[in-house]
Amino acid sequence: MNKEDILKKASKCSTCITKPCQVGCPLNNDTTEFIRLAKLEEFEKAYEVLSKTTVLSSVCGRICPHEKQCQGSCAMKNYYGAVEIGNIEYFIGDEAIKNGWKLPQSKEKRKEKIAVVGAGPSGLTCAAFLCENGYNVTVYEKYEHLGGLLYHGIPEFRLDKKTLNKTIEKIINLGVEIKTNCELGVNIQ
């Protein structure tokens, strides 16, 4: 997917006031806003909008069932076909990885320490948002590899390990501490 393809896909969006695509998104991504910014070729700002609700845009853009969620709710689907929101989302996420755009970070560090059990999509997202809010976060993962079902259950042709690992690296760079091969009740109590 190149920039010209994305601009063409984004141009189909009418940036509806009622935002049915956002309502259809379980994460409540501000879809019309990140697509509006993509149309203006302001991809870094579009990434900032996405990062308010997801730290896994490269991943979700590839594997979410968009046709049942945001795209399935798209107001344009009955006229010109739904806007390909997933493709736009993962393009923006990939641009963030390629250009080294960082996730938002808190300027204020808190004293509290929080443990997150499991480095799957929920655990990593929770850890990232806690860290973004200044908490000291340690993630305990049973296995050697991070990502949970994303790593162990999604085939490589749907989600390549390089994209997944680069996305996880962005989360770790927030200051999240990771401890692998730690099983609750076995290695740690």
Language-model regions: role of each:
Residues 28-40, 48-51, 78, 82-86, ...:
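Beta1-alpha1 glycine-rich phosphate/pyrophosphate-binding loop at the start
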Residues 1-113:
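Ferredoxin-type iron-sulfur electron-transfer modules and their immediate structural context
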Residues 187-189:
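Short acidic active-site motifs
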